[in-house]
Amino acid sequence: LVAPYLMEGFDAALISKSLSFLRKDNVFMEISAPDLKTDQVEPWFNVPYSLSVGEIETVGFKGASLNLPPANPYLPNNLTLLPEDNETISRVTDRPDLQVWLDTDVTFGTPRANTSILLLTDGGLSSQKDRAYAELYRRLVNDTLSTTVYPAYLAGLGYALGSSEAGFSISLNGYQDKQMQLLDTVIDHLFNAELTQERFATFKTGLIKDWQNAAKDKPYTQTLSALNTLLVSSSWSPAALADTLAPLSLNELKKWQTGKLAKIGVIAVLHGNVSAKDAQTLEDFLQQKLPMAAIAKEKSSVADITEKLLLNLDVDHNDAALLLYVQDPDDSFASRAKSGLAGQILRSAYFSSLRTDQQLGYVVNAGIRRLNTRSGNLFLVQSPKAGAADLELATLTFMQNYVDSWQNLSDAEFAQQKSGLISRLTESDKNLGQRSQKYWQNLNDENYNFD
């Protein structure tokens, strides 16, 4: 159910051989904790550690018994493939507090489905405080679910819990038969997670450390993050998020969670081996389970670049990096198509010029960068030998030279590039998940034509 293979035989000799390696003298144990006694320092990363060789001590296992796990409640009973209806995705429920979209799709021949649910919260989760708190709460809920949903994973089901400026999202994938049971579990934990002070402190410390460590990311990675923070209204720097989270207490997080989940609007998509009956079951479940209300979807905005913006980053790294972003004039499909074609034409030429010819850096890329529904052309390079000013000059020189030589591009070459982009954009979906993702992206963009 989990893997794309089937175990059909029982190999006692192989199992015995594998078990023979489970010995006290054949164990590697790593302990990571604060205030450990160490006697050595790793020279490259300056990390203190200690190393001891010998058998490990085993305690606390006397009298332990082994038992088979209980029956897996998520094992599918119904694996019947529905008949293909040849209909496109459509909205089967349209209420102020609930939208449900459905596409019965058995093109890929498996009794699987993908369910995506956006839980709209009043005011969204777009502020610096909301983004920080939501990420911590998301991690804590996943922690409380880890043991509970493991049987679902073994039964071929999966879930993901996310957050955005609009609210929390839940996605389910796998055999459709027991997805509602898994959804019930996930929603119950999202609304009623039993959080302890110990786990709260552990995850809060870990998240703050993750955000603080973003300052140690590769320079080009930091430039991409800074671009988002600069232009997207709901994007905040890792350092700012860490500072916001630092004074938070468990009681404050619980109070925030209660307020944010007091009223919920829902947008849901069912795609795959699912029918109108499944959509109605989902609607009834959500109506019973959630405090439904008409909630406006919070949308982040992207700032217009009306003049040259220069942002200098203080990066603790020997390399220098440059990111140059040319924003589309608007968010129309026409503008996105033009910048997409420009990105395809420029990609190999930019790489060839800065990486191959000038050997300025090992990270060289030209393409498009989409922020919400607004796209633009991006030029990115990281170099161990040239400074940021030199990288900027090299990029601007490349752009000017390319513009000057534009007339040398033949009609046949241009048509070939355009045809290549069209082929890539219209490429058939390889699996159910890829098609589901396109549906979800179009709904987020409010492109109800799904083109």
Predicted features by range, described:
Residues L1-A3, A33-D35, P43-L136, A293-A349, ...:
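His/Glu-based metal-binding/catalytic segments typifying zinc-dependent metallopeptidases
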Residues L1-I31, K37:
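Hard-cation-handling environments
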Residues L1, K129-D130, T148, A166-W211, ...:
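M16/insulysin-pitrilysin zinc metalloprotease superfamily fold
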